[in-house]
Amino acid sequence: MNFNLTPEQEMIRDMARDFTEKNIKPVAAQYDAEKRFPYDNLKKMAELGLMGMNIPAELGGSEVGAVASSLAITEIAKGCASHAVTTSVTNMVAEVITEFCTEEVRKKHVPRICNGDYPAGSFAITEPHTGSDAANIRMTAVRRDNTYVLNGTKSLITSGEAAGVTVTWAVTDPAARKGKGISA
């Protein structure tokens, strides 16, 4: 089995490393101290293809694959954990929407994540009583006509104030065993 990186994977890692050195490390401490969201850097990262890394090109993604994506996020994390978490979650939001949503929802949101029109994507999982233990969430979603009605509370939404789109996790089948019957 060959564990060497491909030239493309090395290029993406090196690009993320270079971007982190030049754009993230110099401002990371200041952003943290000021509790400032890195809108400018996230837009630049989208322009470099770092948002939507595992998304098909027809939706605006860069299709670099899981290894290259992991390498890029690792390099970003070396400069600032906050940038890395936002990048990681935003990519995961794009992946969930691409995989599980209707074509209409995919076409509306995924290109805007990939091109940086949305500063970030967010997950709403965390609840006051259970933290981020998704198997124990209590928020419910009940289908009414052509929509869902949510009932419950989320206590932390990653990048919530800056997100252009939020994927909310809720129980849709209360009769299912623990950890099952949950939808996004």
Each predicted region: which residue ranges?
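Internal helix-loop-helix
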Residues: E47-Y118, S159-V165
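C-terminal helix-coil-helix/basic helical segment that borders enzyme active sites and/or dimer interfaces
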Residues: K25-E34
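A short core secondary-structure module
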Residues: T147, N151-A184
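Short Pro/Gly-enriched beta-strand edge/turn motifs at strand-loop
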Residues: P119-I125
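Hydrophobic, small-residue-rich alpha-helical packing segments that form membrane-like cores
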Residues: G131-D133, Y148
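Intrinsic disorder at enzyme termini
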Residues: M1-E8
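A structural signal for short hydrophobic beta-strand segments in well-ordered beta-sheet cores
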Residues: M139-V142
